[in-house]
Regions:
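Short, low-complexity N-terminal intrinsically disordered segments enriched in polar/charged residues
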Residues: 20-65
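Intrinsically disordered, low-complexity regulatory regions of eukaryotic regulatory proteins
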Residues: 14-15, 46, 130
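Short, Lys/Arg-enriched N-terminal segments with co-localized hydrophobic residues
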Residues: 6-25
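Residues at secondary-structure transition points
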Residues: 8-9, 53, 84, 136
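A solvent-exposed, acidic/Ser-Thr-rich amphipathic alpha-helical stretch
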Residues: 39-42, 56-109
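Residue-identity detector for glycine
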Residues: 2-3
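A beta-strand edge to alpha-helix "cap/lid" segment located at domain peripheries
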Residues: 25-35, 84-162
Length: 162
C-alpha cells in the first residue's frame, strides 16, 4: 500500500494555531477572581516579578490571547503585540526596575500604583510614576490593562531601586 502525503493549505496552520491558543487559555492562572485583598496582592507580586524579569514572552503569558492595553498613548491588542511592545520598550529602557503597590480591588479588577526606574541610551536616569487598572477573565488572565505613566528625569544618586 502506498502511503498518502497530505499537504495542508496555510489556512490549516492558522486553525491549528488558534486551537492551540484556545487550549492554552483554558488553563487556570491562579489566583482567580473574585479577588480578596490577599489574592489581589498575590496577583500584583506575580506581575511585578514577571515585569522585572524583562522577558516579554513570560510577561505575555499572564494576559488573554486578545488582551486589550492602553499604555501611555499606545493601544496594544493581543499577546503578539504585547511581546513586540515589551521587546521595544526594554531595548530602550536599560536597567529597568519596577515596584508595584496594591491600591484597590473588586471582584475581577485590581488597581495598582507603581514606580519604575530606567536609563535611556544616553545614560540619563528616569523614574516613571503611574497607575494601572486591570480586569481579569474567569480563568485569571488579564483581559484589559490601562496604564497612565509620567516620567521624571533623576540623578543616579536619587535612585530608589538599586
Amino acid at each position: 500500500m502506498g502511503g498518502m502525503i497530505y499537504i495542508f493549505p496555510p489556512i490549516f496552520s492558522f486553525f491549528v494555531d488558534n486551537i492551540h491558543s484556545k487550549i492554552m487559555i483554558m488553563e487556570k492562572r491562579s489566583p482567580l477572581p473574585p479577588f480578596t485583598e490577599e489574592t489581589a496582592k498575590q496577583k500584583i507580586q506575580m506581575a511585578e516579578d514577571a515585569w522585572n524579569s524583562r522577558d516579554p514572552e513570560r510577561v505575555s503569558k499572564a494576559y488573554t490571547i486578545d488582551s486589550e492595553w492602553r499604555n501611555r498613548d499606545r493601544f496594544i491588542n493581543g499577546r503578539a503585540e504585547i511581546v513586540a511592545f515589551l521587546t521595544e520598550k526594554w531595548a530602550k529602557e536599560k536597567n529597568y526596575k519596577l515596584k508595584k503597590e496594591y491600591w484597590a480591588h473588586t471582584d475581577n479588577r485590581i488597581a495598582v500604583r507603581f514606580e519604575y526606574e530606567y536609563q535611556n541610551a544616553d545614560g540619563q536616569w528616569f523614574r516613571a510614576y503611574g497607575n494601572e487598572n486591570w480586569e481579569f477573565d474567569a480563568d485569571g488572565y488579564m483581559a484589559k490593562r490601562y496604564a497612565s505613566i509620567n516620567d521624571v528625569a533623576i540623578e543616579e544618586k536619587e535612585r530608589k531601586f538599586v
